[in-house]
Amino acid sequence: MSGLIIDAIDRLMPLIIHSTCLKSKLWDSPHEELPLRDYALSWVIVDRNPKGRVSYQNVTSEMVEIWEAEGIDWQQRAAINLKVASQELWTHQKLRQDGSVVWAIMMHDDGFGSSRILLSHYLDKYFPDGYYVAIPDRSIGIIIPRDLSLGEMQETQDLLESWYDTASAPMSPHLFAPDDLVPEQYLWN
């Protein structure tokens, strides 16, 4: 059994969850509060069936004990796995006529779009003048540069609210500073 758990480290991913999940007995997994206390960072093992559908298994305390006994830095490994799965940081974008980004959407088929906002070190390179993040659904992360016009901001806010209203796992219709949702000591910052 421990060999299977050790092998699962290659499929370990960080997952941002709403804190209401923690209040239910359905989410009895290791987690870390994020600076914005409505959200937490947890971890899951990703599985894909032969048809490519993704399913998750919550990390258990037993898994953590085995990884730590083997000297595996499991949180660092989850961060690395997320980066490797994010060769394309976003899947969709809207550009201005000058080629600058109005918004970038992380809606990868693995369902970890919201978790990709943890890649702040890499996102900072694309948005050196700053940006906001949004997580209308657990599977969607959105990056919005700080220099939007009022019209662009309204259009973006309307988009966020629409996605939030139809989300399968709703998170928030609001914009946040990246530091609100990334742990201070996160592993690539």
Where on the chain are the PLM-derived regions?
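Short glycine-rich, basic-tinged beta-strand/loop micro-motifs
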Residues: 96-104, 134-145
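Charged, alpha-helical interface segments at or near domain boundaries
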Residues: 1-108, 115
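Short amphipathic alpha-helix segments
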Residues: 110-124
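Short amphipathic beta-strand starts and helix->beta connectors
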Residues: 88-89, 123-130
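Flexible, glycine/charged-enriched surface loops at secondary-structure junctions
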Residues: 90-93, 133, 171-174
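C-terminal structured domains
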Residues: 127, 139-189
